[in-house]
Amino acid sequence: NLHHEVTADTAYDEYIVGPTALPGQQDPRAFWVNKSTASLIDDSEPPNYTRYINHLRRILLDELQFRDRDILVLGAGGFTLSHREPSNRYTYVDIDPAIKAIAEKHFLREAARGEFIADDARRFVATSERRFDAVVVDVYSSHTSIPSHLVTREFWEDARRVLKPDGVLLAN
């Protein structure tokens, strides 16, 4: 039974930010998108995130030693990939222009790190002239549903196209 802190409905999604039960964590809170957990964070130092965000951060920062790199994140969620991570440049693309303000005010409780572009992920990778060292694909409309236009061969070709020659593509 959740005690909802904030509920926001936009033209694209329903967002809920509220406390969650995670033993051993300081003030843990969740960011739900369409009733599915999109992001987790707490006030520990360093903060705890969802397992997959911890894993992505470990791959990019520890295993690949990314520093001073350009990272594209398709699907913003709670903006936790770049949270308190100053060593790289992040660009988030999300179809909902309201997600950043909601995440900053109610979930992160601080400014999100990185550039935010309100656009459809497929259109962005199809038309962008920019190139990135990594593309992280994290686009869900619910816990088990990826928008169908983001699982096409053309989408993946365009996601690859915006990579620099030695770039990596990571998908959740």
In which residue ranges do the predicted regions lie?
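A short glycine-rich, Lys/Arg-flanked "PGG" loop and its adjoining helix->strand segment in the class I
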Residues: V151-P165
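Short beta->alpha hinge that forms the Motif I/post-I loop of the SAM-binding pocket
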Residues: D94-P97, D119-A121, V151
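Conserved SAM-binding strand-loop segment of SAM-dependent methyltransferases
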Residues: E110-A121
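Glycine/threonine-rich flexible loop motifs
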Residues: H143-L150
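Class I S-adenosylmethionine
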Residues: N1-L108
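Short conserved loop adjoining the S-adenosyl-L-methionine
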Residues: R123-E129, T144, R161
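Conserved beta-strand signature within the Rossmann-like core of class I S-adenosyl-L-methionine
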Residues: D166-N172
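A short acidic, Gly/Pro-enriched loop at the edge of an enzyme's catalytic core
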Residues: A126-V139
